[in-house]
Amino acid sequence: MTKYIFVTGGVVSSIGKGIVAASLGRLLKNRGLKVTIQKFDPYINIDPGTMSPYQHGEVYVTDDGAETDLDLGHYERFIDINLNKYSNVTTGKIYSEVLRKERKGEYLGATVQVIPHITDALKEKIKRAASTTDSDVIITEVGGTVGDIESLPFLEALRQMKTDVGSENVMYIHTTLLPYLKAAGEMKTKPTQHSVKELRGLGIQPNMLVIRTEEPVEQGIKNKLAQFCDVNSEAVIESRDVEHLYQIPLNLQAQSMDQIVCDHLKLNAPQADMTEWSAMVDKVMNLRKTTKIALVGKYVELPDAYLSVVEALKHSGYANDTAIDLKWVNANDVTVDNAADLLGDADGIIVPGGFGQRGTEGKIQAIRYARENDVPMLGICLGMQLTCVEFARHVLNMEGANSFELEPSTKYPIIDIMRDQIDIEDMGGTLRLGLYPCKLKPGSKAAMAYNNQEVVQRRHRHRYEFNNKFRPEFEAAGFVFSGVSPDNRLVEIVELKEKKFFVAAQYHPELQSRPNRPEELYTAFVTAAIKNSN
């Protein structure tokens, strides 16, 4: 029988529910259990695909092409699993499906209501996520804060699950903030008490509290919360701020969180062996070298827009016993005149993805600086496309060369819309999304990065591609197309072989990086940057 764990949040948003859920998932997986995890987002968008990065942070893409919340990146990195489209559910997606069924007459004339139709659809998503992965345990995080109007149907669905599958198969974990008032010199439990009261008013009695805090929590505070919130005192778990996120599973294990969960759900599983994870954390805490990487992006005011990129760089740094000193460079600020001032102290330059015209000329100048000064450079998605544009302009002398997306009237459309995208009008969910194969050119830097594999599978999110009519001119000038689709139609990786490392990929390699198994192209780039710093 599948076990269901529901993680809710109270008092404030952005409290770290996703990290708590992911950490618990890692502990249960290391007990030998098969775990999956999902995120419920109460916003009305179908998915975050068309949302501004300033609003939402990065869009995380799964193998099957779902555009999802960035928390899924935490889930995959912590638990080391590949999730699917059932792992992110929004209000918009649920209402869209219910209304589509209503239009088809599938409700047989019934009045369509939040209860039971919306809640049934939500419960079906929970069960489908578990069944498609054949999991022993599914962890479901509900976005937002208890008390939000948007969350009510989700919480009602969670309440009903206890009746549907039995109380012994369901556990509710509530994550709250325990504020410390410096003037009073004490922690305040009232916000947590009121949050739990709100949750109980909706019919959900939490079985465990995870309290987010900056300071150590005395046992007396835990006992008080246990008494007023009606949970066992040992089930009041402290989640204190840490230097590195990957310490959190170890901190939770030290408080027997996973054992309490297993006892509640009657899961007979051996103790979690966290030896390898602990060794990784110890290594992360004691890195001996540092290298500076300049990230040239258009959304640098909100680092979450590049969360997976940053994590992938860190992972590759761990593999090289090196801390990444990340320099955030706003692409809007980069010009041909100041590129050396902004980028001259960087050991490597990464140009990640994005959409739209703003900042693209600055990215092109950053790429030009890297090429002309032989600074290791990695381009991702739009960064790959602009790498091609930069080469066309400044090596092939194609004045005004550009992407058709950015300048439809350009004489040299180096990047063009994909053929199967021409007639598509909707923006959302219509990109080339998900896992696709890439055939590597033997002897190339890309092939060497991937240990001379013939084909790798990586996740994509794009609508435009390299215009193949320009391939002969590029190749004649030494531009290497080192990765292509198996039918040779789509360019996936480009590089300049004579440079230390000048490689750009159309796909998003960062989405498959793990802290104990870094993505190979990122590792090759970071390794080159470290060598460049010596």
Curated annotation (Swiss-Prot):
One Pfam family named in its UniProt record: GATase
Active site per database record: 381, 508, 510
GO molecular function terms noted in the UniProt entry: ATP binding; CTP synthase activity; glutaminase activity; identical protein binding; metal ion binding
Binding, L-glutamine: 54, 354, 382-385, 405, 463
Assembly and binders: Homotetramer.
Known regulation of activity: Allosterically activated by GTP, when glutamine is the substrate; GTP has no effect on the reaction when ammonia is the substrate. The allosteric effector GTP functions by stabilizing the protein conformation that binds the tetrahedral intermediate(s) formed during glutamine hydrolysis. Inhibited by the product CTP, via allosteric rather than competitive inhibition.
Protein name, as recorded: CTP synthase
PANTHER family documented for this protein: CTP SYNTHASE (PTHR11550), CTP SYNTHASE-RELATED (PTHR11550:SF0)
